[in-house]
Amino acid sequence: MNISANPAAVHKPLGKYCHTTLVPASARWLVVSGQVGIDKNGKLATKFRKQAEQCFRNILACLRENRMRKGDLVKTTVYLTDSRFVDDYRLARSRVIGDVTLFTSTLVVVDGLASPDILIEIEAWAAKA
């Protein structure tokens, strides 16, 4: 079982994440490449929140394919093309991921992604003991 924590000597997280996740040595790891807001039919959502929700749906599909669940998430790295998307990102994450054990997360605002129509990309790491 992964153990998430926020050390007392570190500031309170600025969002819904934790500062550390301890993964047992016996864990099976899954690394999910950056997911964008494209559905299984190859259609890119046009609105930011829909893209963000699709990113998380894609990640959950990758977890299921490997006999993992959202509680096995250890880390995400999120790339946004505009800092004004942060609140909508958080809403999309809560809507799709819901209340799970918190995992570590890094959010970065970048000038652009692989296509100007892609507004968000999320890479994920998961571990299952």
Give the ranges of each region predicted by the language model:
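N-terminal presequence-like segments and the immediate start of the first folded domain
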Residues: 1-57, 61-75, 80-129
